[in-house]
Amino acid sequence: MRGYDLINAVLPDELILEIFHKLDGLKSSCDACSLVCKRWLMIERLSRRTVRIGASGNPDAFVKLLVQRFVNVRNVYIDERLPVSSPFQFGYSIVPGPTHTIKKRRRTKNARPSLEAPHTSEDSRFEERELEPFSLSDAGLFTLAEGFANLEKLSLVWCSNVTSMGLKSIAEKCGSLKTLDLQGCYVGDQGLAAVGECCKQLEDLNLRFCEGLTDTGLVELSRGCGKSLKALGIAACAKITDISLEAVGSHCTLLQTLSLDSEFIKNKGVLSVARGCSSLKVLKLQCINVTDEALLAVGTFCTSLELLALYSFQRFTDRSLCAIGNVCKKLKSLTLSDCYFLSDKSLEAIATGCSELAQLEVNGCHNIGTSGLEAIGKSCPGLSELALLYCQRIGNSALFEVGRGCKLLQALNLVDCSNIGDDAVCSIAQGCQNLKKLHIRRCYEIGDKGIITVGENCKFLTDLSLRFCDRVGDAALIAIGQGCSLRYLNVSGCHQIGDAGLIAIARGCPELVYLDVSVLQNLGDMALWELGEGCPLLKDIVLSHCRQITDVGLAYLVKKCTKLESCHMVYCPFITSAGVATVVSSCVNIKKVLVEKWKVSQRTRRRAGSILSYLCMDL
């Protein structure tokens, strides 16, 4: 009977609660359920396990409201880079507006921009904190600790007003805490020591840009909860040295993941971790003062290593990678970025010893050439992802071997590889027909021939990016449209592509959700008309620097693509204020429009000011 609830009254709360637990976890799904009726609203509040909020617009009051309404929360994520999205008001209006991505850090006059911080007490910053009323404070953390005593995950990203006092309240009240992210927080040693003393189940700790910490805090934490710690990240903490890592090596014997980015860490610290943490599986290092000696120890003791990432090392040689290849037989992922002294011998050693390798990235290692990658192609049949960035010495024959030997390859990324051309891409397309993702940028020897072969052979391709590839034209996109069902396409700067290529994509890729056609001088309204007809799921489009597109084509596109969420259209001379108004008024889901400020009418600005972004011209 219409208007009469036949089933809701007989469903017990426990059953509805169980149904809510089966949802996808998205906030939109939870909110939709809570709007059914008051009973479902109350039950949904009981079922909510995760909240994500920004830390601007009086976050302390916002946290207090959350604690009152969602009593069973286990995971809290607070990020000061994000604005609070709340319909509630706390004695004043919350108006959307521009927010600073990262707040200005407190520094001494001579401090280095990212690695050093002033040595000031937390009390001396009280007056300064009063000038920032829209940041999460210790009072907010105290409320959080009192309300969410069963908290398991807490992320505080760039909450610069939080101090040791607030962190101590969390530690004392939330003994079940397992994950703690303090990125960009100016907490001190006392707070970290309290976490070590009280949170004996802590497994994951992130200390990126925690400039107020010293060895004292991390040593105390390691002694307190080192037995449970499995993941540790340290970056730009100028006062954390080898002393801390020695404590980690001594007390954190179950550590599996370690990420270090510091010029103050030397061999001694990494050696201690390698010897003490034999269960290490993930190691990421950006430490310019670490040498072969440290990696030789990793190769000796860390036999379970699965992921190794080395960034900007000037002191590593082939000896290090040979040691890794000889011992770390389980290695599945390897990233080498700006390691200038590594040569083909390193990749040959990895290929010989690490046959399970699935992911390889070589970025700016100028002494690594063709023979090293050939060895990978011959010996690592399980390779699924390959990225070659700024590898001028790697030629076609290397990808010939990858095409022959790595049939499971699903993702290939090529950036500024001047010696790789169409023949190499053809070999990959014919040999790796499971390819799903292909990104190519500024590889000027790659043109229509290679991309046509991809369209003919790689039927599972969904993500294609061809940025500033001068030799790629309409014929390539016609083949892609006929052979692949893309979801993501970026052809920015491919000036030979025009309407014909995009029309083929529109007719052959109905599931397209992202499109970047910026800097295509030959693209006109006909392509936009076809995109509107053929790609109804399109959410994001970049049209900047397309000088033939007009308001007419734009109007037809937005009329048909009702799911559009973002549109970039700067430097399009034939798009006027009328076109901008059409986008804003026609797309109910639009979240961002990037355009020149002078093209926005007063009416459009009043109607949709919060979603408009302007090109910065006044430099």
Show where each model-derived region lies.
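N-terminal adaptor-interaction module of cullin-RING ubiquitin ligase components
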Residues: 1-184, 188-222, 226-234, 238-241, ...
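C-terminal capping region of solenoid repeat domains
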Residues: 85-87, 94-130, 216, 224-225, ...
